[in-house]
Structures are given as structure tokens and as C-alpha cells.
Amino acid sequence: MKEFVISEAKVETAVLVGLITQTQDERKTNEYLDELAFLAETAGAEVVKRFTQKLPTANSVTYVGKGKLEEIRQYIHDEEEAEREVGMVIFDDELSAKQIRNIEAELKVKILDRTSLILDIFAMRAQTANAKTQVELAQYKYMLPRLQRLWTHLERQGGGSGAGGGKGSVGLRGPGETQLEMDRRIILNRMSLLKERLAEIDKQKATQRKNRGRLIRVALVGYTNVGKSTLMTLLSKSEVFAENKLFATLDTTVRKVIIENLPFLLSDTVGFIRKLPTDLVDSFKSTLDEVREADLLLHIVDISHPDFEEQIEVVNKTLADIGASGKPMILVFNKIDAYTLSLIHISEPTRH
């Protein structure tokens, strides 16, 4: 399935939106928006503006308040800066179908959330049939509860006709409930097929792991873009694709490594990130099995990152979610040459 969010034909401009809440202070929100901007750039968008708002929790109707939404609308449609052509607004949290529908109706531009952006990047990065199948399944899981919103969006954009040939109108009068239900069945059938394919892939990979013999298996884990693939290249003395972008690695790479006459198998797999979509973790079960089946985990940490401690916690939580938290683990601090205490926002030395 092709990526369905950002076109590669031209660079689209984007506005980011985040919330400062009771559980997420301003510094944390700005860090999350920095990461969201990196995600947007990885997907091929150019970020031109950020908006934040202090709220106890996200507005269930429009995510931000009415006044803030109007401020964003005015910025997007400011005639004095028409050449800016803001193409999308990206929200730092996952939005419900109702929120997306209401925000789109107000802003009249494409609305994305962190989840759809991550899914788009995964779709761009997927190279093998295995990765493509896993991403497609995750996309359908995300899309299914939002089908009605997608149909409404298409009707507004194209004014399509329904099964009876009549011109479309507001809501679902164009495609109609029958078409909506038909599409839902098509997606459910496609998801069943993808799950069957992944089950076969699971069996094949399990056989491959069994055929590797009794060599010790070591897996590199860590936050995305911390240097796992670079370390893999160094230890295995073979080229592994590495790039200063998020999720440069999706497919698992396994190499035989010998250090001081001790042979072992070293695997490099997808990195983790804050607010990683649950559906994506579930869909990548066969890839993450390399982590679950490992004898030892090397947890790579970018020690130069100002929020490296939270990144450690995110990785540990994700490992627990996939059933790999009990594995023997060694913390490996990377980019130590760029580390300075002044970069770390802590009141006392870190426990790590």
C-alpha cells in the first residue's frame, strides 16, 4: 500500500500544534514538537509555524480551544502571506475521527496527527514484502474507525456521486451508507488477508531462527535515530544502511559477529519513539520477534540528547509492551563526544 499522507511531488508546508497540560509542561511540549518537526521533515514537509495552548486536557471536539483554532485558521488563510500556502496542520497527539472532521471543517486544509505521520514514514521506509505488509495492516487499522470522516472529506473535495448517480452533498449523501459499509467490508477482508500473510511470515522467521543453531543472539534496541545501525556496521564490519533521519531502519538486519573468538548473531531492528501507535507495534510483531527471542539486548542511548532519560523510559516501556522486558540488558551510551552536563535539564546527576 502506498503512503497516504504526504506527496513526494513537492515539498508541502506544515503547521504544528501541541498542548501544554497538567501532565505535560511547556518544556516537554516543546521537546515533543521538536520531535514532531523532525518527523515532518523526514516525511518531506517543511514546518513553518508552531502553535501551543495550555489546557487541562485536549478538547474532545477540536483538540484546542475555539479561540486557538481561530488563530490557526487566520494564520493559514492570511491573504498578506498567501505565498506561504500552508498545506497541512499536524497535531502532536492522535486525533479521533470527530476531532479531525471538526478541525478540517474549520481550517479547510489537510489534518494529520502524530500517528498518521509515523505511519506515512513507515510506508516510505518499507522495502521488503514483510515490512510493507506490516505497514499496510497498521494503516488499515488506523483508517477503519475513520472511514466516515474520509468519505466526508472526499465528498467536500470532489463532490462525487452516489450509487444512484445523484450529486453528492454534505456528509455521506454522495457515497451513501451502502458504499461506506462496502468499503468497511473490503478493508476488513484485506486486513484478514494481511494477518494470514504475517502469520506465514512468522512461521518462516521462526524456522530461520531455529536453523541458525545455538549461537547467542544479541539484539540492538533503542530510541529511533540513536545510532543503532552505525554501531551494527562497526561491530559486524559490514555496511548497514544508516541515515540521520527517523526510522531509517524498518527491516531486521542480522549479522554474524565474532569478538575475541566469541561468535554471536547481532540483529538491528526498528527504533522506538514516544507515542508509538499501538497498532504499529502489533503489526510489527514478526519484526520485533527478533527482540523477544534474543538472549541479550544492547540498549543504545544517545547520551547527547537533552531528554535521553525519557527516551530510555520509552524504550523500556515498549519492551515491556512486547514481552521483552525481562531480557538481560546492557546500556550502551552513544555520541558521548557530544555530551555535556549543561545540555541535560536535571537538578542532580542522572542515575544512569
Residue ranges and their predicted role:
Residues 1-120:
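N-terminal accessory targeting/assembly segments
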Residues 8-9, 77-83, 256-260, 265, ...:
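Conserved catalytic network of the ASCE P-loop NTPase/AAA+ motor domain
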Residues 23-27, 59-61, 125-126, 239, ...:
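Flexible beta-alpha connector loops of hexameric P-loop NTPases
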Residues 49-52, 295-300, 324-336:
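Conserved beta-strand/loop subsegment of P-loop NTPase cores
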Residues 282-304:
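Inter-motif core of Ras-like GTPase G domains
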